[in-house]
């Protein structure tokens, strides 16, 4: 895979506060592979906008509560 993304996320925490959902269960609900969930969770892959919204919906959370992008000082 390429270089890590600057986007961070709260997916792992959200999985645990939502009944200790497994990566496999989240992958099933998103119709992606478990490996994709792992890569997104670890910041090695940025999801498509569609998948990002689906993740937020699974956790009934706003998109910016799931994903964060650092502000640029430029």
Specify the residue positions occupied by each region the protein language model found.
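Short basic helix-loop element that most often maps to the first helix and adjoining turn
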Residues: 10-29
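Residues in the helix-turn-helix
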Residues: 25, 36, 65
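Recognition helix of helix-turn-helix/homeodomain-like DNA-binding domains
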Residues: 32-46
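Short, charged recognition helix plus adjacent turn
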Residues: 1, 57, 67-74
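Key DNA-contacting residues within the recognition helix of helix-turn-helix
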Residues: 12, 38-39, 67
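DNA major-groove recognition helix of helix-turn-helix/homeodomain DNA-binding modules
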Residues: 50-65
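Residue-level detection of the helix-turn-helix DNA-binding "recognition helix"
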Residues: 5, 16, 31, 42
